[in-house]
UniProtKB/Swiss-Prot annotation:
Protein name listed in UniProt: UPF0251 protein PYRAB12660
One Pfam family linked to the record: DUF134
Similarity remark: Belongs to the UPF0251 family.
Gene3D superfamilies hit by this protein: Winged helix-like DNA-binding domain superfamily/Winged helix DNA-binding domain
Source superkingdom: Archaea
Amino acid sequence: MPFGWGRGRGRRRKRRMIGFLPQVRHFYPAIPPVSIRQPPIIMTYEEFEALRLVDYEGLTQEEAGKRMGVSRGTLWRALTSARKKVAQMLVEGRELIILPQGNEVVSDEE
């Protein structure tokens, strides 16, 4: 299906520039928790890239937003969501799976 089709109502999602595809896309606890198994946490490539640029590369939110082709506010929302998901994974001992949304464009601009 072409980009932007079949999403229903609302605006089309803007393309996100991704500079690095994660080599490992599935994280799980070495020792599963004894409690009832919870569903995995799903992180998007957009959230992963925001986390990588700001927390790993040390870019400002403004610089990271420009690199991804989004506003600082959009970058902030993706970064906040990614940080929450990582914390949830660590605290609750849940699986984390990183998946594309279909609106990412891999760029070699570093």
